[in-house]
C-alpha cells in the first residue's frame, strides 16, 4: 500500500466507523431500522411511508408496508453491518447497511420499493434507473414519491 493510501486510510477511517454488526435488528419502515436504542436511517434513499398506498390495476395496496416487509425478508435474522455517515435533522444515525456485503439501500431501490434521494445523494440513481426501466415495484404502479406524500399528508 502506498504511503498516501495508508495515511488517507488512517485519517478517514475514524469518520466512517462500523456502527453495528448484529442480527438483533428491528425494521421500522422501508428505510429505517433500530439496533438496540439506535435509530438508523438509510442514507441516500427514501422509501414510502408506512401508511402510504399505491395503486396497481385500480387496486390500492399498502406499498409502505410492502417496502418494510421486503426489508424484513431480506434481513431474516442475518448479520447486518452498518457504516455510519452522520446524523439527520431528527437525530437518527445516517448509515449504509449491508447483509452479506450487499447494500440494503441498493437492494430496495433496485427492487423498486425505495427511491434515490437525489436531494442528498446521487449514489443510488443507477439503481433507480434500473428499477424504473424494468417497471419493478412501485414503478409498475401509480404512486406519489415519499417526499411528496409527506408534504401532502
Model-assigned labels for residue ranges:
Residues 2-8, 14-153:
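Small beta-barrel nucleic-acid-binding modules, primarily SNase/OB-fold domains
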Amino acid at each position: 500500500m502506498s504511503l498516501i493510501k495508508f495515511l488517507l486510510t488512517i485519517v478517514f477511517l475514524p469518520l466512517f466507523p462500523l456502527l453495528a454488526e448484529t442480527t438483533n435488528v428491528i425494521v421500522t419502515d422501508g428505510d429505517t431500522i433500530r439496533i438496540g436504542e439506535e435509530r438508523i436511517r438509510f442514507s441516500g434513499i427514501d422509501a414510502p411511508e408506512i401508511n402510504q398506498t399505491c395503486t396497481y390495476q385500480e387496486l390500492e395496496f399498502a406499498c409502505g408496508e410492502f417496502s418494510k416487509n421486503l426489508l424484513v425478508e431480506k434481513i431474516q435474522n442475518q448479520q447486518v453491518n452498518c457504516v455510519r455517515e452522520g446524523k439527520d435533522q431528527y437525530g437518527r444515525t445516517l448509515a449504509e447497511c449491508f447483509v452479506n456485503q450487499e447494500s440494503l439501500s441498493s437492494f430496495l431501490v433496485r427492487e423498486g420499493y425505495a427511491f434515490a434521494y437525489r436531494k442528498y445523494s446521487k449514489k443510488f440513481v443507477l439503481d433507480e434507473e434500473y428499477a424504473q426501466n424494468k417497471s419493478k415495484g412501485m414503478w409498475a404502479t401509480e404512486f406519489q414519491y415519499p417526499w411528496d406524500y409527506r408534504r401532502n399528508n
